[in-house]
Amino acid sequence: MANLRQTPLTCSGHTRPVVHLDFSSVTKYGYFLISACKDGKPMLRQGDTGDWIGTFEGHKGAVWGVALNKDATKAASGAADFTGKVWDANSGEELHSFQHKHIVKSVNFSKDSALLATGSNEKIVRIFDLNKPEAKPEEFTGHTSGIRHVIFFRNDTHLVSCADDKTLRVWDRSSGKEVQKMDFPSIPNSLEVSRDGTVLTVTHSNHVTFLDSESLNKIREFSVPTTVNSASLHPDKTIFVAGGDDLKVYKFDYTTGNEIESFKGHFGPVHCVKFSPDGELYASGSEDGTLRLWQTTIGKTYGLWKCVDGPQINNDAITSPKEVPAI
């Protein structure tokens, strides 16, 4: 196995940089992957193969953030057209469009899919009730610059957000107040809550920081050889992956921080990386307009990686047409 090289599956179809992505949980139909792109057209794919399922048509500006609910029945997107939209992931139909006063950078579903959180350049975190879409949203104020990411956590009793004001903040939904705050020396580029809810993964400058999700105490922090735009912790917490400005996708040991391997496949900076819910692969999105899927264990028979030995699979095994219809 040692002589096997990593052959990512390349998912084309976007026409501009891919800036964010999200996986659903494992469903009876497998799991799914959604990508945010500056072309304004989020795409839904089968998560283990990258096969294109459909494109959500309706935004009039770059899409900055995307989310899938757990069972992949709903998708959400936040965009430069000042809206956060919720979509039926089966039909592609737009279900809700929530108007904001500035660019919506981040969207996230609650566990029960009844609520949508948004973070925008208005410096406000909002929660919309999808069962009462006309109702006034809950609002959380305190950030002093545009918000990059917002995520439900602690069983949806709280939200965690990070912003251009170089802070990470935790919001208590019952009081509507900020209850914890952490300052960083540089802008936090990415934020992830681990699948079991116990660890926050934050990237800033060339660092990846892991925080205890209750106390916000630093569990560990490692430096990466480049400005790191995104990092993701494996579901079993043995390894993490990171990507940034030097076009490489890195894999590190979570305990020691030692680099295990790195791969160059993209032709532009890597903007986002994320492990699949089963941990068998990780996806990366880049300035080059592509998504790539990488095997966690190189050579394992999984998804479209059917060869363990012998010829490598075609790097463009998965492509979708440049112009694709709505779902």
Where are these regions (language model features)?
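A short helix->beta-strand "capping" segment at the edge of beta-propeller domains
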Residues: M1-R16, T49
